[in-house]
Structures are given as C-alpha cells and as structure tokens.
Amino acid sequence: MKHKIAILSDIHGNATALEAVIADAKNQGVSEYWLLGDIFLPGPGASDLVALLKDLPITASVRGNWDDCVLEALDGEYGLEDPQEIQSMRMTQFLMERMDPATIVWLRSLPLLQKKEVAGLRFSISHNLPDKNYGGDLLVGNDTEKFDQLLDEETDVAVYGHVHKQLLRYGSQGQQIINPGSIGMPYFNWEALKNHRAQYAVIEVEDGELVNILFRKVAYDYEAELELAKFKGLPFIEMYEELRREDNYQGHNLKLLANLIEKHGYVEDVKNFLEAIKSEYKMD
C-alpha cells in the first residue's frame, strides 16, 4: 500500500498560502497531512485558517513556539516593558477577536513530539527539538551532531519545522532528516533565491520504504493576502507588508517595534486585553 503524506509547517497566519498549498497537495494525490506547528501569527488567519485545517485528514500535530507565545499571552505571562511581549499580546488580542476559544483548548492539547509508524517505517515529528520548540539548534548550517538530537534508535526518519527552510540531510548514523520549509513565511539568506511561494513537502511510503521525498514551492496571490490583512485591521501591518513584498520580517528589531507601538497606541490596547484575559480567555 502506498502512503502519500503532506508535511505542513509554519503557516504563521497566512491562510491564502495555506489554501494554495492544500490545492496543490490534493493535486499530488496526498492521503493524509502532518502539521508541525506555528499555525497563527503574524498573519491575519484565524477562524478562516482553522476551517481550512479542519477539512483535512490530519493524522499528526505538534505545537510550535509561536503557538506557545499565544498561550503565554493568554495566560498573562507577558508585561508592558518588552516591545516583543507587547507585540505578542496585541497580535494575540487580534487573533482571539476572530477565533473560537475552543481552538485554544486544542492548541494546548498538542504535544511537542509525536511518533508515527507508517508501513513499518518509524517517524519522529516535532516543531524543533523533541523537547524544545524554540531556539537555533537546528539551523540548516549546523553540524550533524546538532541534528542527531532529533534521532534515537527507534527513529528512521525525523521531520521538523521551525527554521523556515527546506532541508534534506542525514544523521551521523544514516537516518533521514526532512524539513518541509514554511508555508507562511519562508526565510532566505541568498538574494537570488528569494521568492513569494509557499513551501511544504510530500513524502511517499510504500511497503515500508521511503520511496519519494518531494519539496514543493507553490505560487499564491501574496498581494491578496496583504489586502486581506489590511481589511481585517492586522496590527503591525507595516511589518507584514514588508514580509509579504520583500520576504523580510523584522520581528527582532526592537526599535521598529517600539516606534510602531507608540505610533498606533498599542499599549492601551494591550492594557485592555490584560484585563479581559483575566476572566475571558485564561483557561486552567
């Protein structure tokens, strides 16, 4: 029996890109989907994005670091001193105004690691490391010993996301490692390789063998995605516009964040949000 699996990662709120990827995956004859986390933000996708995912036969899901940021914001773990924390809270406020709180219950339930066996082939599925969904341990240029952290004697193939780059390599003992790239915000270091396409991967397993690994880059209307973000009133829209048009996201530019926070009065919005989550969103 042949299993054709689409590996989806790092959607980051880009429902327009996700829709294009799903259409492409169906054309590829995919029978199931694995979801590697970082589902929401900084893009505007909320309930519309969830609706797309609910229609898919998803057989494995793990939680990413941006998913944890949403949960931490809802749990009141952030304050008003750090521009990145203010951004996370304002973006989470935007998200929760457009999404069923039941989605947060589902998000909390997702593990960091999931193991799957497909026709006798053993897979490890994580957003980043099996026990750590953040950090730079698995950047594509790192040494093999770093990637060995994904592997154990019961893993034939490890798949992970997080670094927003498609990757195919091996561990020191020969196990396969796959990164499908990012659907919503791919990263590029080399200018000539920049493009506006959504990335994902398709793997084919037949009779216990990994017979095909296909990296896909799918064109979509990124200007329509940007217009949708503007129509919805996405906070920090200036940063999203640069991401969509220039493939550059300045999430670590504290000066830029501080300027935008002051320009749009986001601190007051966040203060109101902090009051609201004490009773409305926080879940035990």
Feature locations, PLM:
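Beta-strand-turn-beta hairpins that frame and shape the catalytic cleft
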Residues: 1-6, 115-124, 172-176, 209-212
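N-terminal active-site segment of His-dependent metallophosphoesterases
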Residues: 1-56
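Active-site neighborhood of phospho(di)ester-bond hydrolases with catalytic His/Asp-centered motifs
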Residues: 7-9, 33-38, 42, 60-65, ...
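Active-site environment of divalent metal-dependent phosphoester hydrolases
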Residues: 12-17, 41-44, 66-71, 159-171, ...
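Metal-dependent catalytic neighborhoods of phosphoester/phosphodiester hydrolases
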Residues: 39-56, 71-81, 169-172
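Active-site neighborhood of divalent metal-dependent phosphoester bond hydrolases
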Residues: 56-114, 123, 141-154
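Ligand/cofactor pocket segment of small-molecule handling proteins
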Residues: 127-180
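Acidic, His/Gly-rich catalytic cores of divalent-metal-dependent hydrolytic chemistry
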Residues: 174-284
